Amino acid sequence: MIYAKELGTDMYSICPEGKLPVGFVEVTEEEYNEYLKNKEQERIAQLSMRRGDVFEAMLLAKNIGKPELRAMIEQAPLDDLTKALYLNRFDEAIDFYRSFPAFDMLGETLGITGAMLDRFFDTKDWHYLTTCKLTINATPDNAIVVINSEIVNEVTVPYGSVVDYTVSCDGYESKYDVFEITKDEVLEVVLDEDTANTEPIIPDEVETESTGEVNEE
């Protein structure tokens, strides 16, 4: 498998090894992946939603209405022309496009990341404007909790995130899980004692199955 680009165009392709089409040149995997990334960014930027649906989503996700959102733009540290353009589009647009810069500005204030906005416009699901908190209470108390590669017992992540956790402790069997989180979760994780390497205790005067000898201790 090789990666190829058509000369004079922005067309990229994946071709079988040794079968480069006429008019194409071979490119690196990194260049091909960058092309895919840019195409996805272009697609996301063109996503749109009806203004009423966006305002409704903000109410459901953040309990913030249109007047509050407009006030945030008015109070933003922008030059007069940029602020006027933002407010004009905010007031007059029939549809809102993901590429509208005011969304990233508002998102930063409201704790909504660019990735969360991308997912919201892509799915039209207001839940993707929210976050979920995962708390893990481990037993025994000295167990180590690792969530998404960090030693913590509590994290807050965007709705729909995939989280993984490990709970471990000397002398106990570790527990691991990975799942998609869509609501606040509190997990009670109780570790079982690790008996796999524990030497068996043989009572006095009991014949062992392995040797047939009597234990006299």
PLM regions and their residue ranges:
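A short, solvent-exposed loop/turn motif at the edges and junctions
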Residues: 167-177
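Short proline/glycine-enriched turn/loop motifs at strand-loop junctions of beta-rich domains
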Residues: 137-143, 160, 172
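Short, ordered, surface-exposed loop/turn motifs in non-cytosolic proteins
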Residues: 130, 140-150
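Exposed beta-strand and adjacent loop surfaces of beta-rich binding modules
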Residues: 1, 133, 142-144, 162-164
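Viral virion structural and adsorption modules
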Residues: 5-6, 15-136, 173, 180-217
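Short, solvent-exposed S/T- and G/P-enriched segments that are highly enriched in secreted/extracellular
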Residues: 147-159, 176-177, 181-183
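Exposed beta-strand face motif in extracellular beta-rich ectodomains
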Residues: 161-165, 185-187
